[in-house]
């Protein structure tokens, strides 16, 4: 374990204080308090970037299995259910950590949690590459799941607590940007090592040096000033703030931090399920929103991208991995403008646009796949020697040839596509359609001249259908990346009062990982039963349902302070008023409580709440 200085010691607070920072958890982009005096120094920015490396590691681990599974399922002869377990074991660890990680973060500090998560990720990766077995694969993936869940919470909170108020949204968004960048790197890695012997080891091992470097760097960075205040070390907190803000007087910000900590003790965890301040409605909105994040299908596209692409015509591992790299590129390109424009366009608008485009692209993908005569069942068959394709047997079986044997590869390329069948036991009167026998000498391979009987799939996917499927998939990914990808976490950070925001975020995070686990654990089985087209149609229905939910229940918080949002949502008839507004476009006045505020405490642009007015959130520079 990496030692830390006394200011991060294990002697304070249980779970009450957690990530309810002054202005919200991950994704908060504004606040009701006056802006802090200092701007973000270069030191603050570099500290945020160092912490956000956790997002890069999280994204890499989430996207990595898409390509690694193509090799591992052959080497271990994995069944459909075993493949699902390999993918979902990471989510099991993440779900368990989401239930208990907050206590660790509160007791030992955000910075120490990031260091521990980096070390645990390296340890889990070592387990994966030391020896390939199904049991060790599950154990290593569970350890990595615990790591990424812990780092997701800790990184988000740490950056939010060291960032100046009016730059918090920008700095916290670095974590989301790092996540999608990590996914892109994972897909590039999948492609780079797709045809390399033991390429899966390189895929799993690439993150180890980066994780170690982050752990070392985080050791030399300061703890969160808010955490120091929680421990009663106000003098140390003041020193950290002066270093982060490059100003000599941090009294005002320290006062705001202490005030927000007092607010946390006004609520208990069980208040989330009571009518106090309409909290029950708020938590139901939050839980339903993260439910739609998962049930619209994005996790399966992330984990099974290469598998899905193989089923629609990208038949080689290399082609499927290259096509899935486009998914990573689209995620990065789409996330950047969404992050930069959310303060001007609004999270609700992005959610509506994203859900609408997702439903259209999923419908297109489903219709296209109805016309592709391709059996998805081969994804779920056992990848034993009797069921391996010739290419899988020659190039990926344990102990077989390396990538350097160019003469063998050149000889293999001369075999026609219709010769690349699956090994099947023959005899007993079996006469499968498309049966063929071919004889092939494999020079310089150490293999004797052998006859192979194979069963070929005579269905060839038309190029137009194959590329239309890929285009629909990329549009779907882009729509998710501007809508249900980043925006729910911004909404969640704004709809709960500061005193209970951290615990609400923890509960919704557990819901997110839990539903993700259930969806990913059954994707291959369900697709095998009903077909990829009908899976797309189900996701289309869920996308339309999410659109209706966003329109009716999600407030437009653009241009509004956190206090204004909280006052509006605290009304017992909030849902009724929101639905009535959508039906009759009636205008709602600013709550009278807000009219009593001092002029300097109000945002003049926010005359109406939840989208009633079309004002914009003030620029950070104003």
Curated annotation (Swiss-Prot):
Its main location: membrane. Residues 1-26 are annotated as: Disordered. PROSITE patterns: MFS, SUGAR_TRANSPORT_1. It catalyses: D-glucose(out) = D-glucose(in). Keywords: Cell membrane, Cytoplasm, Glycoprotein, Membrane, Sugar transport, Transmembrane, Transmembrane helix, Transport. One of its GO terms (molecular function) is transmembrane transporter activity. InterPro entries: MFS_dom, MFS_sugar_transport-like, MFS_Sugar_Transporter, MFS_trans_sf, Sugar/inositol_transpt, Sugar_transporter_CS. Expressed in skeletal muscle, heart, brain, kidney, spleen, adipose tissues and to a lesser extent in small intestine and lung. Residues 66-84, 133-141, 190-201, 304-321, 371-471, 525-533 are extracellular. One of its GO terms (cellular component) is membrane. Belongs to the major facilitator superfamily. Sugar transporter (TC 2.A.1.1) family. Glucose transporter subfamily. This is Solute carrier family 2, facilitated glucose transporter member 12.
């Amino acid at each position: 374990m990496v030692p830390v200085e006394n200011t991060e010691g294990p002697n304070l607070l249980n779970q009450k204080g957690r990530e309810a920072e002054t202005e919200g958890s991950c994704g908060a982009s504004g606040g009701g308090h006056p802006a802090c005096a200092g701007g973000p120094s270069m030191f603050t920015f570099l500290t945020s970037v160092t912490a956000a490396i956790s997002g890069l590691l999280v994204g890499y681990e989430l996207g990595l299995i898409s390509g690694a599974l193509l090799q591992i399922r052959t080497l271990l002869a994995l069944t459909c259910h075993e493949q699902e377990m390999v993918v979902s074991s990471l989510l099991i660890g993440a779900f368990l950590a989401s239930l208990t990680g907050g206590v660790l973060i509160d007791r030992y500090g955000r910075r120490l949690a990031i260091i521990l998560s980096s070390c645990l990720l390296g340890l889990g990766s070592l387990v994966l590459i030391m020896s390939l077995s199904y049991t060790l694969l599950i154990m290593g993936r569970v350890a990595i799941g615990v790591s990424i869940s812990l780092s997701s919470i800790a990184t988000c909170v740490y950056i939010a607590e060291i960032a100046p108020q009016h730059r918090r949204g920008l700095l916290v968004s670095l974590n989301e940007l790092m996540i999608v960048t990590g996914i892109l790197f994972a897909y590039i890695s999948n492609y780079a090592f797709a045809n390399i012997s033991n390429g899966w080891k390189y895929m799993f091992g690439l993150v180890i040096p980066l994780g170690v470097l982050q752990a070392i760097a985080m050791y030399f960075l300061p703890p969160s000033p808010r955490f120091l205040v929680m421990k009663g070390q106000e003098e140390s907190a003041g020193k950290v703030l002066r270093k982060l803000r490059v100003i000599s007087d941090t009294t005002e910000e320290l006062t705001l931090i202490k005030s927000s900590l007092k607010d946390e003790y006004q609520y208990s965890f069980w208040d989330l399920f009571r009518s106090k301040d309409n909290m029950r409605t708020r938590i139901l909105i939050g839980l339903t929103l993260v439910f739609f994040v998962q049930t619209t299908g994005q996790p399966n596209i992330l984990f099974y991208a290469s598998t899905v692409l193989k089923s629609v015509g990208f038949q080689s591992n290399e082609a499927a991995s290259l096509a899935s790299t486009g998914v990573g590129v689209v995620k990065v390109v789409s996330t950047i403008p969404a992050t930069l424009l959310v303060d001007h366009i609004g999270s609700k608008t992005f959610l509506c646009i994203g859900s609408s485009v997702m439903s259209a692209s999923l419908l297109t993908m489903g219709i296209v796949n109805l016309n592709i005569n391709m059996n998805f069942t081969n994804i779920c068959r056992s990848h034993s020697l009797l069921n391996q394709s010739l290419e899988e047997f020659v190039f990926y079986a344990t102990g077989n040839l390396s990538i350097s044997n160019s003469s063998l590869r050149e000889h293999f390329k001369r075999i026609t596509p219709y010769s690349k069948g699956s090994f099947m036991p023959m005899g007993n009167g079996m006469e499968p359609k498309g049966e063929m026998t071919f004889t092939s000498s494999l020079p310089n391979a150490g293999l004797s001249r052998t006859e192979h009987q194979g069963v070929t799939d005579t269905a060839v996917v038309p190029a137009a259908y194959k590329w239309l499927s890929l285009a629909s998939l990329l549009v779907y990914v882009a729509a998710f990346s501007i809508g249900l990808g980043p925006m729910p976490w911004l909404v969640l950070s704004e709809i709960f009062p500061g005193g209970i925001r951290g615990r609400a975020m923890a509960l919704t995070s557990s819901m997110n990982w839990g539903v993700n686990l259930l969806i990913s654990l059954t994707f291959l089985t369900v697709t095998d039963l009903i077909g990829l087209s009908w899976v797309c149609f189900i996701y289309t229905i869920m996308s339309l349902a999410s659109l209706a939910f966003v329109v009716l229940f999600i407030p437009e918080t653009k241009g509004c302070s956190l206090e204004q949002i909280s006052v509006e949502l605290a009304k017992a008839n909030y849902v009724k008023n929101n639905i009535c507004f959508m039906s009759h476009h009636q205008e709602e006045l600013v709550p009278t409580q807000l009219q009593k505020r001092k002029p300097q405490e109000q945002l003049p642009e926010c005359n109406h709440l939840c989208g009633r007015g079309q004002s914009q959130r003030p620029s950070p520079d104003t």
